[in-house]
Amino acid sequence: MVLYYILLPLAWLVFHIGFRVHTVGRENLRKVQTKGCIIAPNHVSAIDPVFIVISRFWGRRMLVFAKKELFEINVLLTWFFRCCGALCVRGTKEELEIIDRTVEACRAGETLLIFPEGTREKEGRFLPPKSGLFVIAAQA
């Protein structure tokens, strides 16, 4: 978790120097600064999670769902994801444990970032959402 708070300002600086960042609807995020919420955007690019976490408010950790294949790319990336608190979604009974953990985190006021389609859609079209988002929202 310490890595999360060290890398967040660094990433913010790099992305604001290298990219023109424009966040739409940021005022809606400010409304829930002190409450738990679920952010469920369309997933177009591999860099989406980074931009979303950076555009969030400082000092608030965001739980990010990541599909298991991302944890299998290499050891360094797996270590990085774990240090940042990413939740590995495997699609098995472990998913129920993740859902329970996520519901508790939302109730405790944390923010969850989940891409409901479970994958990227590079053309920007919406894919059918997976059921996990709805289960979490209903229980939280």
Please provide the spans of the model-predicted regions:
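Helix-enriched interaction subdomains in cytosolic or periplasmic regions
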Residues: 1-11
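Soluble catalytic domains of membrane acyltransferases
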Residues: 8, 17-140
